[in-house]
Amino acid sequence: MNIIEGNLHLNGDEKVAIINGRFNHIITDRLVEGAKDAFLRHGGKEENLDLILVPGAFEIPMALEKVLSSGKWDAVCCVGAVIRGSTPHFDYVSAETTKGIANVTLKYGKPVTFGVLTVDSIEQAIERAGSKAGNKGFEAMTSVVELLNLYKNIKA
């Protein structure tokens, strides 16, 4: 049996975008830093990394649609933070953001990762943005690197 997988090294010519829903920016800024760190550590060049800012997580899917339809980027890492409050707003935003990102990803067939935190408390968000539970932005970008290489290997 042949095993096809992606490695964790970029050639340096890959163009990647980070789309950041900046609401809860104290958290999302840390996710962006983690994503940038992963991109550079795995061989990406800073001039090939773009940060696209949108107001919040709900706006990420439309920005993703615009980014992928432009053909300028090879992959996208989506980050944001939706924190549960006392109203159903959390449920609507997290569900529609997730569905929107998934639908756009399937439409274009390019590597897109979901680094949007959907958490019950600010404490959980802090843990996932570089504290006890690691940095989910770093993890999402590491998955971008792996998927870029996997998709190249599948085409070869």
Swiss-Prot record:
It catalyses: (2S)-2-hydroxy-3-oxobutyl phosphate + 5-amino-6-(D-ribitylamino)uracil = 6,7-dimethyl-8-(1-D-ribityl)lumazine + phosphate + 2 H2O + H(+). 5-amino-6-(D-ribitylamino)uracil binds at residues 23, 57-59, 81-83, 114. Pfam families: DMRL_synthase. Keywords: Riboflavin biosynthesis, Transferase. GO terms for biological process: riboflavin biosynthetic process. Pathway: Cofactor biosynthesis; riboflavin biosynthesis; riboflavin from 2-hydroxy-3-oxobutyl phosphate and 5-amino-6-(D-ribitylamino)uracil: step 1/2. The active site is at residue 89. The keyword DNA-binding does not apply. (2S)-2-hydroxy-3-oxobutyl phosphate binds at residues 86-87, 128. CDD domains: Lumazine_synthase-I. Its EC number is 2.5.1.78. HAMAP family: Lumazine_synth. Catalyzes the formation of 6,7-dimethyl-8-ribityllumazine by condensation of 5-amino-6-(D-ribitylamino)uracil with 3,4-dihydroxy-2-butanone 4-phosphate. This is the penultimate step in the biosynthesis of riboflavin. This is 6,7-dimethyl-8-ribityllumazine synthase. It comes from Campylobacter fetus subsp. fetus (strain 82-40).
